[in-house]
């Protein structure tokens, strides 16, 4: 209780602090290494390899671990027999999605967008300084971040669409059974 005798609402903590840590850690590691690497390394190859490796680890962790745990979504892309790209989505049911921790979800989405914005800004700096080689590093990292943004955004929309279809089918079937039972009694 506070001095004014008002009851304070409980502060919601992160439900999955380790997952949140690794979700942020790999993004931060890739960005920090890229930004600070010029101070410690003269070799573009080392900077390229380590930065892209950290960004790839971030991509994998977000796509396969933190996306599933923090927001209940997972996506992947397959090439079918006709050579067409097919998006596949997994999501928790709507009830489970509604129970997801709001802080975890907030952290997931904001860091996803902020990391992409940071890579974009670094790309602009590379353009201004006429560093095409560093623009390549930024382009790879930005592409990985944008792929996750697109994948998870499509997955979230697909989950909402599936819920709406399920709700309309449930309502229609209940209405149909109510109408049938009404006519059966007559």
From Swiss-Prot:
InterPro entries: TVP23-like
Entry superkingdom: Eukaryota
Bilayer topology: Multi-pass membrane protein
Keyword list, A-Z: Acetylation, Endosome, Golgi apparatus, Membrane, Transmembrane, Transmembrane helix
GO CC list: early endosome membrane; endosome; extracellular region; Golgi apparatus; trans-Golgi network; trans-Golgi network membrane
GO annotation (BP), single: Golgi organization
N-acetylmethionine sites (modified residues): 1
Transmembrane domains' residue ranges: 35-55, 108-128, 132-152
Disruption phenotype: Severe size reduction of all organs. Abnormal cell wall composition.
Subcellular location: Golgi apparatus, trans-Golgi network membrane; Early endosome membrane
UniProt family annotation: Belongs to the TVP23 family.
Oligomeric and partner information: Component of a trans-Golgi network (TGN)-localized ECH/YIP4 complex made of ECH, YIP4A and YIP4B. Interacts directly with YIP4A and YIP4B.
Entry function: Mediates trans-Golgi-network trafficking and cell elongation. Required for keeping the appropriate balance between secretory trafficking and vacuolar targeting of a subset of proteins. The ECH/YIP4 complex is involved in the modulation of the trans-Golgi network (TGN)-mediated trafficking of some proteins and cell wall components (e.g. pectin and hemicellulose) to the cell wall in dark-grown hypocotyls and in secretory cells of the seed coat.
Protein name according to UniProt: Golgi apparatus membrane protein-like protein ECHIDNA
Designated gene of the protein: ECH
